[in-house]
Amino acid sequence: MLKVTTSRPWVCSRCVRRQVQSRRRLATASTQYRESRPVPVDNSAPGAKRDDRTLRQIFDSPNFWAEFSQSSKQSYNRPAVGLFQNRYLVNPQGFEVFANTSLRKAQRIVDKVLSASTVEEYRHVARELDRLSDLLCRVIDLSDFVRATHPNAAIQAAASRAYAKMFEYMNILNTTTGLDKQLEIAMATPEIVAGWTEEEVVVADILRKDFAKSAIDLPRAQRERFVALSQEISEIGPEFVDYMTPAKPYLTFESSKLKGMDPVLVRQYTTWGQTKIPTIGGAAAAAIRSVQNEDVRKEIFMATRTASRNTVYKLEELMRKRAELAKLSRYESYSHLALGDKMAKSPASVSQFLEALSKDNNQIVEGEVSELLKFKMSNSHGSSPGLQPWDKDYYMSQILASVRSHSRNSDFLSAYFSLGTVMQGLSRLFTRLYGVRLAPHETMPGETWNSDVRRLDVISETDGHVAVLYCDLFSRPGKSPNPAHFTLRCSREITTPELEEASSLSQNGLFKTNEEAANDGMATSRASGVLKQLPTIALICDFVTMSGKSSRPALLSFNEVQTLFHEMGHAIHSILGRTSLQNVSGTRCATDFAELPSVLMEHFAADPSVLSLFARHYETDQPLPYEMVAEKLALDKRFEGSDTENQIILSMLDLAYHSDLPLSPSFSSTQIYHSLQQKHGALPVDPPGTCWQGFFGHLFGYGSTYYSYLFDRVLARRIWQVVFKDGEAGGSIQRDNGEKMKEEVLKWGGGRDPWKCLAGVLDDGRVENGDEKAMAIVGSWGVKE
């Protein structure tokens, strides 16, 4: 089965999770204050000093950016070069030309693979199928991004049509027998496999497993049922996510009963003394955290935790169809189908990990519950005994407010984090760890989708130009508020036959050279004599700028700094994971390994040595006093055990729903959820009558892999401790440590067993086999600092 990059269940769980539930941020560094002197900047590489200075200015100085971007447009004096320098995409019609050209190339590859009959021809099957995947991704990934991001409706529509055309072709390939048989023949011939590179072996194995999942070898009737089920799942899943509703959409109270809630917020929902609060959204969450009247809090809590009957029905129908699909594909359950190519390998291993993590976390949560109960007993009169489910968020909020009142205002922190200095800091950090830096690059006419977009070239000390990063970081009307990292084109080696094929395109005047034609005009590099298409990445954030003619730069909150570091963790994985084959490049690795580099970067964002590289007051240029960060981290970590418990239970729930239980006539998603809370939780259990699982939208996107973010939190914390020495003695900015991470983890993308990557970077052979024992060991490491 051929897959595109965007088909991964999620790109960035850190940001996506905020859409469904409010979650306390994980503090990712020790809060103990460590004094750190400013670290000198390494500007030894040619042009590095200029790039370092310019990097800050293009984000922090509107005047400098206006001059920088305007001069680039004037200097080229030429027509539009196309989005991302893709020469086809100079106008809406170009998307159809791009799709049709790619489609013809893909069809030639399919014919070539299907007609293979000699050893020499079979030797190329793995690489040809990888190129086929790349051709699909070139159109689908880029078009998917453009249709969601570009402000021009005509271009959006053209991108959508190109996306649909290639996606339809991909589905045809995935239900057509022949490609899988040819791959099987190649893999079963020792003479052929012996001549393959390590990457070719890995890619062939990935494709073989994917073909098996697609039921392509089933009898015709069963295969048709598989296709029908897949279509039904693709329809009911989005319906469940997009149209989930509460049983009671609104609750009405006399405004006098909402004492404690922000009066400004209350007035927004009040008419003639009656306050009508929507039960889903920020207002209800704020009420549960702040309303003093326990009966009111209880009523709101019950409503926010009770999905409509139709929503729960859609959820259970989705689970039943997935269970049937798995059985049809000869798997014990959908979890077995989904986890076979993940680090976990099986549901049993995930359970081992979650139970070990739960055991490690349980004592922490019990302490937090005890603190909440003690606070309730000393600050309430006549309320219900014990800690009730509707008490938790309220008393957490009360405790945090009392702590916050004795600390510095966290708003002061943002003065030390102008966007330009943070980008400068990321570049300096990457230079120290990995020998790559971010270099501002003037864009050509038509290259970007908005005038606010900055292009950064990634420059390596040893390999020169290695990636292109488009940064769309400022807020504007109509733009999605959710931060994200998009891989628009993956790394891949371009072969000599491809250059020969491209000669016909370069002769029509659209491209100047065969090399340009082979990659549609987008960035390439010929380091070490090998031509490669370079990773092309888009980074989207929604940072607020000052309105009008203010010269003040965009100032980030500390949470926004962590978010930017997180997203750049995905980017550095794409940048350093420049493999020869597309299927294993960068972030195209096991789902439960993909978040590791990004979560690890959150640790760097809170480290004194890293912050000393860049965090300075935007007006006075004074360095950041680290105790301000330490206070913020201590506050964020106050109840992290409770958050971890919730994530553990949701991960267990995801696993249970994707077992064979949905095929039972007595399947009840509510009973399963409440039973898991009772068995594994120390926090108050949801009351009878509630059915919160109807709001668990990630069940569709994650499908047995919700544990992944917890898993990667544990891995990231362990690597931070072992490899980067918890940041002690400058361990967070030492090249040797960065090289260890790059050589053992990042450079492989998905081309190496992630358990071998983990064992190598930690020098811990106990986990190399990746069995249930290894999962239990990882779970025992825990997430608590």
UniProtKB/Swiss-Prot annotation:
Q: Where is the transit peptide?
A: 1-26
Residues annotated as catalytic: E567
Co-factor binding details: Binds 1 zinc ion.
Q: Does the keyword Zinc apply?
A: yes
Q: Which SUPFAM superfamilies match?
A: Metalloproteases ('zincins'), catalytic domain
Region entry Disordered, spans: 26-51
Superkingdom of origin organism:
Eukaryota
Per its UniProt record, what Gene3D superfamilies does this chain match?
A: Collagenase (Catalytic Domain), Neurolysin, domain 3
Q: Which cofactor does it need?
A: Zn(2+)
> What keywords appear on the UniProt entry?
Hydrolase, Metal-binding, Metalloprotease, Mitochondrion, Protease, Transit peptide, Zinc
Q: Which family does it belong to?
A: Belongs to the peptidase M3 family.
- Known role: Cleaves proteins, imported into the mitochondrion, to their mature size. While most mitochondrial precursor proteins are processed to the mature form in one step by mitochondrial processing peptidase (MPP), the sequential cleavage by MIP of an octapeptide after initial processing by MPP is a required step for a subgroup of nuclear-encoded precursor proteins destined for the matrix or the inner membrane.
Quote the protein name from its UniProt record. Mitochondrial intermediate peptidase
Q: Which organism is it from?
A: Botryotinia fuckeliana (strain B05.10) (Noble rot fungus)
